[in-house]
Amino acid sequence: MRVTSPEIQRGIKVSELLDMFGSTAFNARRLGEAAKICEEMVKSDSFVFLTLAGAMIPAGMRKIVAGMMQNGFISSLVTTGANIVHEIVESLGIGHEIGSCYVDDTALAEESINRIYDVFVGQEAFERVEEFLSGIIEGLDGIYTTYEFLWEVGKRIPDERSFLRIAAEREIPVFCPTLHDSIAGLHMTIYRKNLQIDFFRDVSRIIDFCFQKRKMGVIVVGGGVPKNFTLQAMLLAEGFDYAVQITTDSPQWGGLSGATLEEAKSWCKLKPDAKAVTVYCDATIALPMLYAYLLDRCGES
């Protein structure tokens, strides 16, 4: 099969462009392969995890995550405490501002503005989050998994487009193994009375999912704890059938975010014949394109 140049025409769909990428090279081809694997995941009725590391919510990816839940493209989300906090910031109508990385950060601090590369968020946003969460935390009694606690949070979020609210309404588990490593964790430490979070029950539940009699898939955005928490659950099962990883890290430094999916096969986290591809690309580019592809090719799952 020859490499062919995409024939770009006015009105082309994202799905058509990604199909053309499949006969190009480098990471365009990898992104085209990822689209096909994601399509097969959904159409085969696989149980699909989305793992989300990095500052994806401040970067504007919340509606992509929510849409993937609403359309049945993902079955569970595994993410960081930071992304949860920033989703609450968005859900309360505060939001994040377009900023710049070429600024005087000391001057920003004096104005109570926090910087996430080229995104700004005011300190008052986190004060609003504290006000919102404190009432929930103080009112809960007993032992919860992270996803059960986040369902309670989601039930109280007014924004219908919030992925936390959608997850609560549909009982989609949102695992957050680093919930305590976030501003939300600080608030829980301060305000909890009889509330306890059982992280080990999270592990038991995600392992249960991995033993289902259906195909299993994972879309890995970045790496870190969400990636490891999800892949390690397969150590006791048979391994994932499908896997797509979007990362900007490379493997030779030995870090998990750059570890290839082929390496994961040595741990039996992926089946030997698993369909898998790693796309080296900014996830804020690749993830929306994959979502648009699935909308066109799969509709509502």
UniProtKB/Swiss-Prot annotation:
EC number: 2.5.1.46
NAD as UniProt keyword: yes
Transmembrane segments: none
Molecular function as annotated in GO: deoxyhypusine synthase activity
Domain of life per record: Archaea
Enzyme class: transferase
Recorded catalytic activity of this chain's protein: [eIF5A protein]-L-lysine + spermidine = [eIF5A protein]-deoxyhypusine + propane-1,3-diamine
UniProt entry tagged with the keyword DNA repair: no
UniProt pathway annotation: Protein modification; eIF5A hypusination
Keywords: Hypusine biosynthesis, NAD, Transferase
InterPro entries: Deoxyhypus_synthase_arc (IPR022899), Deoxyhypusine_synthase (IPR002773), Deoxyhypusine_synthase_sf (IPR036982), DHS-like_NAD/FAD-binding_dom (IPR029035)
Active site, UniProt feature: 269 (nucleophile)
A cellular component annotation (GO) from this entry: cytoplasm
Necessary cofactors: NAD(+)
Matching PANTHER family: DEOXYHYPUSINE SYNTHASE, DEOXYHYPUSINE SYNTHASE-LIKE PROTEIN
Family: Belongs to the deoxyhypusine synthase family.
Biological function: Catalyzes the NAD-dependent oxidative cleavage of spermidine and the subsequent transfer of the butylamine moiety of spermidine to the epsilon-amino group of a specific lysine residue of the eIF-5A precursor protein to form the intermediate deoxyhypusine residue.
Protein name, UniProt field: Probable deoxyhypusine synthase 1
Organism: Archaeoglobus fulgidus (strain ATCC 49558 / DSM 4304 / JCM 9628 / NBRC 100126 / VC-16)
The gene coding this protein: dys1
